[in-house]
């Protein structure tokens, strides 16, 4: 078949479910596998933002597993979220930048243009672009402070309106939330 289905997800597990309200990650995983096993190609679209970083390894591990099981059938694209600024990865701190560098290394070590069960160089280049953008374009000064305050306000308001709990979904970012709140 010549069909291709594009599916959007920005992280994995409870974090992906918090980001995309109404998402059931287990159902998403089953649906991707069902499409692939039926011969339908899938393109995973990640709008890469700050909240993608903590559990992104789990997402790319899933993608790699599916690439190995269904060669030629799955691609991943990682365009960067630039707006709203308070959710962009440009508000990250040094710890998250280091984590992002580790993620790039993981993708690099699992990239080959001769092994169809790995990431390809185009996918790697797009992800390296995310890291380079974060490293060279991070917000500073008042812009950083304002966007981090807006980040906290967004989290609090999102949880209030949707009856969700960001703190449960993102325990590894609790320190960052507290930093931003000061």
Tell what function each PLM region has.
Residues 48-54, 70-103, 113, 117-133:
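Flexible glycine/acidic-rich beta-alpha junction loops that bind and position SAM and/or redox cofactors
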Residues 6-8, 45, 96-107, 182:
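Charged, low-complexity, helix-prone segments enriched in Lys/Glu/Asp/Gln
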Residues 24, 88, 92-93, 155, ...:
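Helix N-terminus capping/helix-initiation residues
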């Amino acid at each position: 078949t010549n069909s291709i289905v594009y599916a959007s997800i920005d992280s994995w597990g409870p974090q992906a479910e918090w980001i995309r309200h109404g998402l059931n990650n287990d159902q998403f995983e089953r649906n991707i596998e069902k499409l692939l096993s039926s011969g339908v190609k899938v393109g995973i679209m990640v709008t890469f933002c700050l909240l993608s970083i903590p559990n992104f390894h789990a997402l790319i591990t899933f993608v790699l597993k599916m690439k190995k099981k269904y060669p030629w059938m799955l691609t991943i694209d990682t365009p960067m979220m630039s707006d709203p600024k308070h959710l962009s990865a440009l508000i990250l701190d040094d710890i998250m930048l280091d984590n992002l560098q580790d993620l790039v290394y993981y993708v690099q070590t699992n990239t080959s243009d001769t092994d169809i069960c790995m990431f390809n160089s185009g996918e790697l280049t797009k992800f390296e672009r995310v890291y380079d953008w974060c490293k060279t374009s991070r917000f500073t000064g008042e812009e950083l402070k304002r966007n981090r305050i807006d980040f906290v306000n967004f989290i609090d308001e999102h949880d209030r309106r949707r009856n969700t709990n960001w703190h449960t979904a993102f325990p590894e970012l609790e320190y960052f939330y507290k930093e931003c709140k000061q």
